Amino acid sequence: MSITAERKSALIKEYATVEGDTGSPEVQVAILTERINNLTEHFKDHKKDNHSRRGLLTMVSSRRSLLDYLKKKDEGRYSKLITSLGIRR
């Protein structure tokens, strides 16, 4: 259900703006998107897991805030990120 360390490292390497970058909005959104996708798969089998659903809603809200920030700062990076992650907006 959670992301493996290898997958997280791959996401960081793919979306980092500079070497060793783990805090940029792109990296944070990519990691949150991976966690959200894992949880949506979890809910296909466990429909009544409302405790995890609350965590999912928190993650979606956090991702939305980061995307709004990125759109305000640099719209080019924002549009590139949502197309590469397949997020609709």
From Swiss-Prot:
One of its GO terms (cellular component) is cytosolic small ribosomal subunit. The keyword Ribosomal protein applies. Keywords: Ribonucleoprotein, Ribosomal protein, RNA-binding, rRNA-binding. One of its GO terms (molecular function) is structural constituent of ribosome. It comes from the Bacteria. GO terms for biological process: translation. One of the primary rRNA binding proteins, it binds directly to 16S rRNA where it helps nucleate assembly of the platform of the 30S subunit by binding and bridging several RNA helices of the 16S rRNA. Belongs to the universal ribosomal protein uS15 family. NCBIfam families: S15_bact (TIGR00952). Part of the 30S ribosomal subunit. Forms a bridge to the 50S subunit in the 70S ribosome, contacting the 23S rRNA. This is Small ribosomal subunit protein uS15. The lineage of its organism: Bacteria, Pseudomonadati, Pseudomonadota, Alphaproteobacteria, Hyphomicrobiales. The gene is rpsO.
